[in-house]
């Protein structure tokens, strides 16, 4: 709903690589930023061909990727891979959101980097727990008042 109010079109696709190819096409045809959002782990690995294509075409695509919850990072959780290391060779810049209050700044930086100098794709990682209210996260992990229950 909020995206419609801001004039942002959401287009759902069946495969992550298609999302990035579509974002690249939007950028090339309209000179407006193309943005793709994909799920963590295998969803992100599926984008590599299209990301590399955008890099070689100097296309400023913004790729948003989910990530495992911050509390589970590096512990072998479902879809927990080093996404930043995977994408670094193929994008101009990578960023990760570590706190909700940093979302705006990281997104602003991503758009700046995508267009600065030679244009190219950028990647932002969004851990899943930052996209939900704190109360939901505490319930997921059995936390109350900052202590494990």
Can you name each region flagged by the protein language model?
Residues 1-149:
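N-terminal alpha/beta PP-like core and its mobile active-site loop of ThDP/TPP-dependent enzymes
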């Amino acid at each position: 709903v909020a995206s419609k109010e801001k004039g942002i079109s959401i287009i759902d696709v069946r495969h992550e690589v298609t999302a990035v190819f579509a974002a690249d096409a939007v950028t090339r045809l309209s000179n407006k930023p193309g943005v793709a959002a994909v799920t963590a782990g295998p969803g992100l690995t599926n984008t590599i061909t299209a990301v590399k294509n955008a890099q070689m075409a100097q296309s400023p695509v913004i790729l948003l990727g989910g990530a495992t919850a911050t509390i589970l990072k590096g512990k072998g959780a479902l879809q927990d891979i080093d996404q930043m290391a995977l994408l670094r060779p193929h994008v101009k810049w990578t960023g990760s959101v570590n706190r909700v209050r940093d979302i705006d700044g990281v997104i602003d930086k991503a758009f700046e980097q995508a267009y600065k100098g030679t244009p190219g794709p950028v990647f932002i990682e969004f851990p899943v727990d930052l996209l939900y209210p704190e109360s939901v996260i505490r319930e997921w992990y059995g936390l109350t008042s900052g202590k494990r229950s």
